Curated annotation (Swiss-Prot):
The protein's name: Selenoprotein P
Cysteines paired by S-S bonds: none
Post-translational modification: Phosphorylation sites are present in the extracellular medium.
Comment on protein domains: The C-terminus is not required for endocytic uptake in the proximal tubule epithelium.
Any matching Pfam family: SelP_C
Start and end residues of each stretch annotated as Disordered: 202-268, 352-381
Function recorded in the entry: Might be responsible for some of the extracellular antioxidant defense properties of selenium or might be involved in the transport of selenium. May supply selenium to tissues such as brain and testis.
Biased composition, class Basic residues, residue ranges: 204-217, 243-255
Length: 381
């Protein structure tokens, strides 16, 4: 159920962050006109939800992203999200141009990969984009989301859920290009979501009960993206760069369509956040700490947000930059996942004990915390 309801906690917290280089006034507006070799990709996608990926052929991560983009396209189509256009725009640099074919071969013929010419106006600059950014537009070509790393990393569900939001929720108001078929599909998705919410088991609320007692300083059921429940005194940090969420400015002027009755204003942001926060992120780790640790709270959450992460098979390894207890026994939200959390030890190895909290210092040592372990295994310096 949590997978199907994965409008991820991260999407709930996105309004807290932004990309400094991103022009926030681009919310719910069409992008500047751009073309590549006399082709207008956005015009060709008119009437479809459009996903524009800014990938760099000379970058290994971008190549991985390209292959995962094809997987995402297939997955969305199987789930019924059929009216979606995917576009890849390669970097303008010479090294990327030389490896254009390699990038193109990583996706199917259903995803066009555009190569910018050397002397043309840089499309990335026009879109205020950076490497690995994903821009999601509605059927009328209005920008709904602009996601950057780490939130655009396709191992995690943020891009997928942002596409689904753009597909079925009128974030920028009514679009006259929405077909009856799409409207019927979105109604069925909404009804299915309501049914699954009603059938939700009680342990979900039991988990929230613990957080309500231990994290009342948060002020609501949603956690700050920077606060670890396992470290209640940890300082709050700004959102990581490379992320811009366009729900932050709902009150701005919209271009083209006057039907504003369906558009949430700034006064509805809290309701929107609460709605999204009721949905769980499959990448949230529930960390059960040893009972014999006096300083250890009952649970901590690693949201996989301020993280360096990788995915190997079905196991997700998170290397957290935040203050975390020196030992966590972690389990994923899905039973079939076997997740090991890799904490970041900030104390010398002798101090890496089960009963001590991590304290930030200039010294940093990798520390792998294993399930049911008796102590934190820290390599010697």
């Amino acid at each position: 159920m949590w997978r199907s309801l994965g409008l991820a906690l991260a999407l709930c917290l996105l309004p807290l962050g932004g990309t400094e280089s991103q022009d926030q006034s681009s919310l719910c507006k069409q992008p500047p006109a751009w073309s590549i070799r006399d082709q207008g990709p956005m015009l060709n996608s008119n009437g479809s939800v459009t996903v524009v990926a800014l990938l760099q052929a000379s970058u290994y991560l971008c190549i991985l992203q390209a292959s995962k983009l094809e997987d995402l396209r297939v997955k969305l189509k199987k789930e019924g999200y059929s009216n979606i256009s995917h576009i890849v725009v390669n970097h303008q640099g010479i090294s990327s141009r030389l490896k254009y074919t390699h990038l193109k071969n990583k996706v199917s013929e259903h995803i066009p990969v555009y190569q910018q010419e050397e002397n043309q106006t840089d499309v990335w600059t026009l879109l205020n984009g950076s490497k690995d950014d994903f821009l999601i537009y509605d059927r009328c070509g209005r920008l709904v989301y602009h996601l950057g790393l780490p939130f655009s990393f396709l191992t995690f569900p943020y891009v997928e859920e942002a596409v689904k939001i753009a597909y079925c929720e009128k974030k920028c108001g009514y679009c006259s290009l929405t077909t009856l078929k799409d409207e019927d599909f979105c109604k069925s998705v909404s009804l299915a979501t309501v049914d699954k919410t009603v059938e939700a088991p009680s342990p979900h609320y039991h988990h929230e009960h613990h957080h309500n007692h231990r994290h009342q300083h948060l002020g609501s059921s949603e956690l700050s993206e920077n606060q670890q429940p396992g470290a209640p005194d940890a300082p709050t940090h700004p959102a990581p760069p490379g992320l811009h969420h366009h729900h932050k400015h709902k009150g701005q002027h919209r271009q083209g369509h006057p039907e504003n009755r369906d558009m949430p204003g700034s006064e509805d942001i809290q309701d929107l956040q609460k709605k999204l926060c009721r949905k769980r992120c499959i990448n949230q780790l529930l960390c059960k700490l040893p009972k014999d640790s006096e300083l250890a709270p009952r649970s901590c959450c690693c949201h996989c947000r301020h993280l360096i992460f990788e995915k190997t098979g079905s196991a997700i390894t998170u290397q957290c930059k935040e203050n975390l207890p020196s030992l966590c026994s972690u389990q994923g939200l899905r039973a079939e996942e076997n997740i090991t959390e890799s904490c970041q030890u900030r104390l010398p190895p002798p101090a890496u004990q089960i009963s001590q909290q991590l304290i930030p210092t200039e010294a940093s040592t990798s520390u792998r915390u294993k399930n049911q372990a008796k102590k934190u295994e820290u390599p010697s310096n």
